[in-house]
């Protein structure tokens, strides 16, 4: 069973979805039964835009951070849709999407400078997947 569509989730519905949840924010966002439509390729930049570390516990997020996260989800998914979707997906006519790894802000950019602060983007392990973070823009504590 899929959760609600991530794109366009309302400013009331999103906090309600997170209320009382345990676990880390990245794991929650990747679970399609919680929120449908966010793949691992998008998650790095969504969390970066919201300035949230992927290992942050959901219960520690402030209302302001939750709203920033909701806005980052909308912005990142809308940007991909405007470009025809992700490069690894095809449309009904077999045409691949135009949103490529080169369009990502920090995703898959380990060792490169952060586009906001210049710190080095790091690759960290988050459960069964890896995640790219800026240690300055997305502090864990």
How should these model regions be labeled?
Residues 114-117, 134-137:
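Short cysteine-rich clusters marking metal-coordination/redox-active sites
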Residues 1-49, 57:
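Phosphate/anion-contacting hairpin/loop surfaces
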Residues 32, 110-111, 131:
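Residues immediately within or flanking Cys/His clusters that coordinate Zn2+
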Residues 101-110, 124-127:
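Short, flexible, mixed-charge glycine/proline-rich loop motifs
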Residues 51-60, 66:
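RNA substrate-recognition surfaces in RNA-acting enzymes
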Residues 121-122, 139:
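Short functional micro-motifs and their immediate structural scaffolds
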Residues 65-82:
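Basic, amphipathic alpha-helical segments enriched in Lys/Arg and hydrophobic/aromatic residues
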Residues 92-104, 115-119:
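Short Cys/His-rich Zn2+-coordinating modules
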């Amino acid at each position: 069973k899929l959760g609600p569509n991530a794109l366009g989730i309302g400013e009331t519905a999103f906090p309600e979805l997170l209320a009382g949840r345990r676990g880390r924010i990245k794991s929650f966002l990747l679970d399609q039964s919680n929120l449908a439509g966010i793949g691992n390729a998008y998650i790095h930049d969504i969390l970066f835009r919201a300035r949230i570390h992927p290992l942050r516990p959901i219960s520690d997020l402030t209302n302001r951070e939750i709203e920033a996260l909701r806005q980052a989800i909308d912005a990142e998914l809308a940007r991909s849709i405007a470009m025809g979707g992700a490069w690894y997906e095809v449309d009904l006519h077999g045409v691949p999407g135009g949103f490529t790894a080169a369009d990502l802000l920090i995703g898959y950019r380990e060792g490169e400078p952060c586009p906001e602060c210049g710190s080095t983007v790091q690759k960290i392990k988050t459960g069964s997947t890896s995640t790219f973070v800026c240690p300055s823009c997305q502090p864990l504590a």
